[in-house]
Regions:
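Hydrophobic alpha-helical connector segments
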Residues: 59, 70-106, 124-128
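An amphipathic alpha-helix adjacent to DNA-recognition modules
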Residues: 11-16, 28, 48-73
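Amphipathic alpha-helical packing segments from all-alpha helical-bundle domains
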Residues: 72, 112-163, 170, 174-181
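The short coil/loop that forms the "turn" connecting the two helices of the helix-turn-helix
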Residues: 9-10, 41
Length: 246
């Protein structure tokens, strides 16, 4: 019994330390040695609980993605009672792309999640269930495994668009529209409906929504790991600055 509690203490210390270091330095800038030193745990204790750094990333990734589809489930209401079920997916993925543009540290966290095979498999399996909910009517013969296979492709699209930062020649609104055109087309949403969905997404204040989502994530992390996290990662790293209306 003591061993179980010792493992739980190690898990909590490592995750708490990793959250803080990842947000301060990014995943690539955080070494295993730094995590072990600041968490005050031995290498053997760490390996017994997590195996390696990817094991830590997997646990944090589950927290990062846990609330995203709950927001997507309610997003369709933004277009009214006749909203397309695909709008919830478009909304969620648009917010995700926007979050990745708020800070290079956040982009790094997302990219690490997509780069880890274990984390990516978790994302694909969970996303496939939501794809089936949102897109079954467009693909009536598909089962969950079919949607899983589709998500192998759409998650590749997401990773590709996340890897390429915005620029003057490739602003965020263009990035989101390109992604939605491609992903919704792959999922067999009719062209006219794709246009309606994309126009609906353009009406949303995605930056404000994305910042609120990150703040909510920080609140969850703060409560879970008893940390004081402040969203100081929003700053000059943001691309596609909007011009002042005045």
């Amino acid at each position: 019994m003591a061993r179980r509690y010792d493992s739980e203490a190690v898990r909590n210390r490592v995750l708490s330390t990793s959250v803080r270091l990842f947000l301060e330095r990014g995943c690539h800038g955080t070494t295993m040695a730094a995590i072990l030193k600041e968490a005050d745990v031995s290498s053997s204790s760490f390996q017994n609980v997590f195996g390696n750094k990817d094991g830590v990333m997997y646990e944090l990734m589950k927290l990062m993605f846990s609330g995203q589809f709950s927001a997507a489930d309610s997003a369709a209401a933004l277009l009214g009672p006749n909203a397309s079920p695909a709008f919830a997916y478009a909304f969620e993925t648009s917010v995700q792309l926007t979050i990745a543009e708020l800070s290079e540290i956040i982009r790094d966290l997302y990219l690490q999640a997509y780069a880890s095979e274990r984390s990516l498999e978790y994302i694909r399996r969970n996303t496939a269930k939501h794809l089936q909910k949102f897109f079954q009517q467009y693909n009536p013969s598909f089962d969950e495994e079919d949607f899983y296979q589709m998500d192998i492709g759409t998650s590749g699209l997401m990773l590709g668009f996340m890897l390429r930062p915005c620029s003057d020649d490739f602003p965020l609104d263009v990035k989101i529209e390109r992604y939605l055109q491609m992903s919704l087309s792959v999922l067999n949403v009719p062209a006219e409906e794709r246009t309606t969905i994309i126009e609906g997404i353009k009406q949303q204040d995605l930056r404000s929504i994305a910042k609120a989502a990150v703040k909510q994530l920080f609140d969850v992390l703060s409560d879970t790991f008893d940390l004081e996290l402040q969203a100081q990662i929003f700053g000059e790293e943001e691309c596609d600055k909007e011009e002042s209306a005045e």
